[in-house]
């Protein structure tokens, strides 16, 4: 089980606090000038296809030594072992945390309550394989005998964000099937998705473990109504709907053949579920073999994370550097900036992955924390972000550590597009690290023939302080395997930080209160009676809503 250790009471935390008195004055230009081997010391490779450069961070070897000591004193290694061995580290829900078992390609036994879960995992994978191959090959026919051409995945949260992100990221591997994802309970989402589709050639995946999730089931019933308006016979539902669920009774009552129900387990958290049957949409989007490659890539990182000493462990290093900024430099957010359009949902995916996991204010003892926990995660693909928010990163008053991610080889070699993209990738981290001094600005103005008055007026606005920290993650090419590597790397980074912060990273009680209140409010919206049961603001909003609808 996880130990309950307040990180701020460790000797390592005290040492880091003292070290920060000097470290807050670190200057990246000076650090690089003082050490010609800095890149070699502060970069790591993962396999043959990923390079992680963390040299442009406000760290020294002494900083990292003290951060590793913090990991040791909060017993990170035993926590890693506890997770992989199936201990119920999700204590508030009494569950193991075993998304790693879903991609356990070495097939070593993983025990939960005395039972090896791997036979069940492999059985579901085999079932997914058969289903996927029948649909992609065209063997599976709709109710009029036509092949299925379009798949609509209906889910929300982890049942949507992961599959959607991966399907987009691996679009170069697309099968003949067209994928669509519906999540929002706003009717516009399902209506606009269905407009161009043909009920005869559309199959729906309903992704809800309990088959009771409000948003998902609302959309599922609307999808069934749309289908039956054309198909007529309720019996045809079985050829056009499948379920990713464990509630066989509700699935059957909906009209879905339980042979087309794919189960997963309570030790699979929603935001880690793309590796499970929830990933069926991924397998349909890119083919089952590529889905397995995705699992293989994640498993490679799992082995690295579980077996590598902390000092050479890439997810651990990334986690500790992030913690350094979050807890000592006072950074409130991190930006994930993929220079690959296919990865346009990567930041959004880990916005959920990180903020739902580590957005906690109570420690594992049930006490309020008096230190910062999870950061705000955000980002957009490059180079779009450069023309949107990089201004603040470069010259604003907030410290925002950034992860830059890019492939060396593009799937679309069009002219010199990729060279231009990558020139920006390299330039941004250089600019953020080293900036532009007043002397350089003055020299540029002088070379451009500016007058002294013009120079004096404009120089302050043209100076870049630099010293903005970044990680650069260079991938040979975005493939199913390297994407699996990347996702698992970030997953384990989140886990490491949660362990050190002494919080539970695998529950999400913060999403419950809003749902409870929404269920109370919903019946109040059914008529035009004035509502008085809430605070004055909520009453006023509900009554204004009713007035607008009248």
From Swiss-Prot:
Gene3D superfamilies: 1.10.1390.10, Glucose-6-phosphate isomerase like protein, domain 1
Domain of life assignment: Bacteria
Main location: cytoplasm
Localization per record: Cytoplasm
Coiled coil segments of this chain: none
EC number: 5.3.1.9
Active site feature: 356 (proton donor), 387, 515
Pfam families in the record: PGI (PF00342)
GO MF: carbohydrate derivative binding; glucose-6-phosphate isomerase activity; monosaccharide binding
Reactions accelerated catalytically: alpha-D-glucose 6-phosphate = beta-D-fructose 6-phosphate
Any single GO CC term annotated in Swiss-Prot or TrEMBL for this entry: cytosol
Stored InterPro entries: G6P_Isomerase, G6P_Isomerase_C, Phosphoglucose_isomerase_CS, SIS_dom_sf, SIS_PGI_1, SIS_PGI_2
Pathway terms, separated by semicolons: Carbohydrate biosynthesis; gluconeogenesis; Carbohydrate degradation; glycolysis; D-glyceraldehyde 3-phosphate and glycerone phosphate from D-glucose: step 2/4
Sorted UniProt keywords: Cytoplasm, Gluconeogenesis, Glycolysis, Isomerase
Main function: Catalyzes the reversible isomerization of glucose-6-phosphate to fructose-6-phosphate.
PANTHER family in alphabetical order: GLUCOSE-6-PHOSPHATE ISOMERASE (PTHR11469:SF1)
Family: Belongs to the GPI family.
Protein name, as recorded: Glucose-6-phosphate isomerase
Gene expressing this chain: pgi
């Amino acid at each position: 089980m996880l130990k309950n250790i307040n990180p701020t009471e460790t000797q390592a935390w005290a040492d880091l606090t003292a070290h920060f008195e000097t470290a807050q004055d670190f200057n990246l230009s000076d650090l690089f000038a003082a050490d010609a081997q800095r890149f070699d010391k502060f970069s790591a490779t993962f396999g043959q296809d990923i390079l992680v450069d963390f040299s442009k961070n406000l760290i020294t070897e002494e900083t990292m030594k003290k951060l590793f000591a913090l990991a040791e004193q909060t017993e990170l290694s035993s926590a890693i072992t506890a997770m992989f061995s199936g201990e119920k580290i999700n204590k508030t829900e009494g569950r193991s945390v075993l998304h790693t078992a879903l991609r356990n390609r070495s097939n070593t036994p993983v025990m939960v309550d005395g039972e090896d879960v791997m036979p069940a995992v492999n059985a579901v994978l085999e079932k997914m394989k058969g289903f996927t191959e029948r649909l992609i090959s065209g063997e599976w026919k709709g109710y009029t005998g036509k092949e299925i051409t379009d798949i609509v995945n209906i889910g929300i949260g982890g049942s949507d964000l992961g599959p959607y992100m991966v399907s987009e990221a691996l679009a170069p591997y697309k099968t003949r099937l067209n994928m669509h994802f519906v999540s929002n309970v706003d009717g516009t989402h399902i209506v606009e998705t269905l407009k161009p589709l043909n009920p005869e050639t559309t199959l729906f995946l309903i992704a809800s473990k309990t088959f009771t999730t409000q948003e998902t089931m609302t959309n599922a019933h609307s999808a069934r109504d749309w289908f039956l308006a054309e198909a007529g016979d309720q019996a045809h539902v079985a050829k056009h709907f499948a379920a990713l669920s464990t509630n066989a009774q509700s699935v059957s009552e909906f009209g879905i053949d339980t042979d087309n129900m794919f189960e997963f387990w309570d030790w699979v958290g929603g935001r880690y579920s793309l590796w499970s049957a929830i990933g069926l949409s991924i397998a349909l989007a890119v083919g089952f073999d590529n889905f397995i490659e995705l699992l293989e890539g994640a498993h490679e990182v799992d082995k690295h994370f579980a077996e590598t000493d902390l000092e050479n462990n890439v997810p651990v290093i990334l986690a500790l550097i992030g913690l350094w900024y979050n807890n000592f430099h006072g950074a409130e957010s991190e930006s994930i900036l993929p220079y690959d359009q296919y990865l346009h949902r990567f930041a959004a995916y880990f916005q959920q992955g990180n903020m739902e996991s580590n957005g906690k204010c109570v420690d594992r003892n049930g006490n309020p924390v008096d230190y910062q926990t999870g950061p705000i995660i955000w980002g957009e693909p490059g180079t779009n972000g450069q023309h949107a928010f990089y201004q603040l990163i470069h010259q604003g008053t907030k410290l925002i550590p950034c992860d830059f991610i890019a492939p060396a080889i593009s799937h679309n070699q069009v002219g010199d597009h990729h060279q231009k993209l990558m020139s920006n990738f390299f330039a941004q981290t250089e600019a953020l690290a080293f900036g532009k001094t007043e002397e350089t600005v003055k020299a540029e103005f002088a070379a451009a023939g500016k007058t002294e008055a013009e120079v004096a007026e404009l120089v302050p606005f043209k100076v870049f302080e630099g010293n903005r920290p970044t990680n650069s993650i260079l991938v040979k090419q975005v493939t199913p395997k390297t994407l699996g590597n990347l996702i698992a790397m970030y997953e384990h980074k989140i886990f490491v930080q949660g362990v050190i912060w002494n919080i539970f990273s695998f529950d999400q009680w913060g999403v419950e209160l809003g749902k409870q209140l929404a269920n109370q409010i919903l019946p109040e919206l059914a008529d035009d009676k004035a509502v008085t049961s809430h605070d004055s603001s909520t009453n006023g909003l509900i009554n204004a809503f009713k007035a607008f609808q009248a």
